[in-house]
């Protein structure tokens, strides 16, 4: 246990409820580390299935997971890391009709998606509900990370009012 966290801090981590949206190259290690840290409740949302091409960059999945939903693969791996975690696997495409219900009641949302349409959808719902948002993006050897909606701070849309032009990354 990290000395600056202590028992009190670990209890707070165990009580935390986190949503991870996107279980690919970024979401895979995020989920692994949340589980290893002892986060008590993790909800993973992704509509996709594991493909052979995913395996080099999506470390949560293996060859036995090909053609399985990414969220089902993630649930199996998390239960091997920490059987006491409450893990909800949600295989669906998020849109305006379901995003709010999926994040309501959670302490933190981590956006591991790969497009600005999804990022704005997630951001807007988090801002509306006052839920902190950690945004991460990776592309090849480049990446970005940011924290939004924290203690009344700015949101993703405040920082990026419109999506970047096509071809710019991440």
Regions found by a protein language model. Give the residues of each.
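Adenine nucleotide-associated cytosolic modules
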Residues: 1-170
């Amino acid at each position: 246990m990290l000395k600056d966290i202590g028992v009190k801090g670990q209890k707070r981590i165990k009580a935390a409820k986190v949503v991870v949206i996107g279980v690919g190259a970024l979401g895979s290690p995020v989920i692994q580390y949340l589980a290893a840290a002892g986060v008590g409740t993790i909800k993973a949302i992704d509509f996709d299935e594991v493909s052979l091409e995913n395996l080099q960059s999506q470390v949560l999945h293996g060859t036995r997971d090909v053609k399985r939903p990414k969220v089902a693969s993630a649930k199996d791996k998390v239960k091997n890391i920490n059987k006491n975690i409450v893990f909800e696997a949600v295989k669906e495409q998020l849109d305006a009709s379901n995003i709010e219900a999926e994040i309501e009641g959670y302490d933190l949302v981590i956006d591991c998606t790969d497009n600005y349409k999804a990022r704005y959808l997630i951001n807007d719902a988090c801002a509306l509900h006052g839920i902190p948002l950690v945004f991460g993006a990776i592309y090849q050897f480049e990446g970005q990370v940011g924290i939004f909606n924290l203690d009344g701070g700015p949101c993703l849309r405040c920082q990026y009012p419109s999506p970047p032009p096509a071809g710019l990354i991440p």
